[in-house]
Regions:
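Extended hydrophobic leader/signal-anchor segments used for secretion and membrane insertion
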Residues: 1-157
Length: 157
């Protein structure tokens, strides 16, 4: 499906209360959602979205799954969500509650499904996110050091 057709089908399924499963594309979510992994999205009411959730929404550039950084309420009562990909340094353009379609509830990695609808609410999600980022940073540092020969294992050990 092209982007517009996928967007239309996704909107229809989620609006009807169905879950949506698809292959993620791109690298903006770093280690949380990798390019080519299967993700499952469940419909969500904007009032049930918390900071730390990965939401699926319609944006000016098409469908997007990014993490909620902040929830902002305007004086007129309109709610907007500041999103960012885990591998990004800057927030995306804020999205309105009407642009949210669902929340990513699981990701399939190497044949195993990982539940992202964590118990423990926002604190649990923040701990999970911190652990993912720490693991990614450690892996990156290990690769960088390993390429310089600093972390070479002694074969005699």
């Amino acid at each position: 499906l092209d982007r517009n057709a996928f967007s239309s089908v996704a909107d229809s399924l989620l609006a009807a209360g169905f879950k949506l499963r698809f292959r993620a594309g791109g690298h903006s979510m770093g280690s949380a959602l990798r390019d080519g992994e299967r993700v499952t999205v469940a419909p969500v009411d904007a009032r049930d979205v918390d900071v730390g959730d990965i939401v699926f929404c319609q944006t000016w550039r098409g469908p997007l799954a990014h993490r909620v950084q902040r929830i902002e309420q305007a004086a007129a009562g309109a709610v907007r969500f500041a999103l960012r990909g885990d591998a990004s340094f800057e927030d995306d353009r804020p999205v309105a509650a009407s642009q949210l379609r669902g929340r990513v509830i699981s990701v399939e990695r190497n044949g195993r499904a990982f539940d992202l609808a964590l118990r423990g609410g926002a604190l649990g999600r923040r701990i999970f996110v911190a652990a993912l980022r720490a693991r990614a940073a450690l892996a990156s540092a290990t690769r960088a050091l390993g390429t310089r020969g600093v972390l070479v294992r002694d074969p005699a050990a």
